[in-house]
Amino acid sequence: NTNAAAARVLDRLGISVSPAREAGCCGATEYHLNAQDAGLARARRNIDAWWPAIEAGAEAIVLTASGCGAFVKEYGDLLRSDPAYAEKARRVSALARDLAEVIAAEPLDALADATPRRVAVHCPCTLQHAQRLGGAVDSILTRLGFDLTNVADGHLCCGSAGTYSLTQPELATRLRDNKLDALEAARPDLIVTANVGCQTHLNGAGRTPVRHWIELVDNRLVN
């Protein structure tokens, strides 16, 4: 479980986590499928779910899926004309952080290990393009001693692309196969990514296992 792994790693780094039990889907899928009202309704519900923690002094809203993080960072803009939510949405977007942003800012000695693993990183479009955090996961894993492979055309999409894999399945499959060929070229032990959509789409090919990068870090702590 990605969120559970993230909570354990953050705890090891001395960062307390307050789960927002009422928070749910960020709304991106519906919004991008032309159901904007439904997507924004989800955004409002999430704002309501997070607001008590924000009022209590929460320093960040941490997202483990880069697609969700990119969308939550847009809440302020998307709800700017809603008098009841505009200011709250702006505050939420300002506090939103991808997990890699939080981990990268911490000393990582507590997570270090002498056992290297050969890993290929797929950086999601929503991390490297939408959030402009390309290389963030690579940097963390390198600091932790993982052996990262060189991946050709790392800027290209894996084919998941939010709802694209649903609306254009044939092209999405070709993009996926091309991406996996690039990721597998240097024979990694496994592939990691930072977005559940990419992870699910790539794993659908049944080739090299694809996991969220924080699960790899968490597994090191457990073992």
Stretches with model-predicted labels:
Residues 1-223:
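Iron-sulfur cluster-binding electron-transfer modules in prokaryotic oxidoreductases
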